[in-house]
Design a protein with these regions (language model features):
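Conserved short histidine dyad/triad with adjacent acidic residue
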Residues: 112-131
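A short, N-terminal "cap"/entry segment at the start of jelly-roll beta-barrel domains
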Residues: 70-112, 123, 193-209
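Hydrophobic alpha-helical segments
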Residues: 2-75, 209
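Conserved hydrophobic/aromatic beta-strand scaffold that supports enzyme active sites
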Residues: 3, 101-103, 111-115, 136, ...
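Short strand-connecting beta-turns/loops that link adjacent beta-strands
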Residues: 107-109, 131, 151, 177-178, ...
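Conserved metal-binding segment of the jelly-roll/cupin
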Residues: 116-119, 156-177
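Ligand-binding loop in jelly-roll beta-barrel domains
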Residues: 166-194
Length: 209
């Protein structure tokens, strides 16, 4: 309760870190604090939440996700506050390479942490809705890319956020030499669906740095 109250006021200073450390000592796990802060982000705002995420990552992991390149999944997982989860078998046919998913918030607005191994990316796709809809990505670890059809790729790092309106053809995934994780947040809408399209070809992807 104290952690959420301080975050909502933007008081992510040394006192906030003290309360995070106390929460950890009292048995709050990394997965639990990630879920708590994500829930609170919808009320306190993502800028305040991101400051809290960074401090929680220091307390629970002590690592730096951006410093992990093409190492093991286990090593990378220790550098991010959100769980990696399980292999994304249900959507594997829409990805090149291995991805993983971990539900963070299941009630209200669903939030899923998606992790991509180095070189992994999803196919071009479009989020559809008759009203509203779309998706928001909040990057939480590693290095990746987002690209809209007809535009240049955008390099992504921890703390970056991308708003994807319904009807926009796009893809996202890891850089060739780095793991990458983002929260995928479904924007509420009517008759939401996703249309999966062609893969991002190796020649096209190889142009990325």
């Amino acid at each position: 309760v104290t952690v959420v109250a301080l975050m909502s006021q933007g008081l992510t200073d040394s006192s906030f870190k003290y309360h995070l450390e106390s929460a950890k000592k009292n048995g709050v796990t990394r997965t639990e604090i990630a879920e708590i802060l994500t829930h609170a982000a919808f009320y306190a705002g993502w800028p305040k939440a991101w400051a809290a995420f960074r401090m929680a990552k220091e307390v629970w992991t002590g690592g730096n996700a951006d410093s992990v390149a093409a190492g093991s999944l286990e090593a990378y997982a220790q550098t991010i506050i959100f769980p990696v989860g399980k292999p994304n078998d249900a959507y594997a046919k829409y990805f090149i390479g291995q991805s993983y998913t971990a539900p963070v918030v299941t009630d209200g607005v669903p939030v899923v942490n998606v992790t991509f191994e180095p070189g992994c990316r999803n196919n071009w796709h479009v989020h559809k809705a008759t009203k509203g809809g779309g998706q928001t990505l909040v990057c939480v670890g590693g290095r990746g890319y987002y690209q809209e059809w007809g535009k240049e790729p955008v390099e992504l790092h921890s703390g970056d956020a991308i708003n994807i309106p319904a009807g926009v053809k796009h893809w996202h995934g890891a850089a060739p030499d780095s793991w990458f994780s983002h929260l995928a947040i479904e924007v509420p809408g009517e008759n939401n669906s996703t249309e999966w399209l062609e893969p991002v070809g190796d020649e096209e992807y190889a142009k990325l740095k």
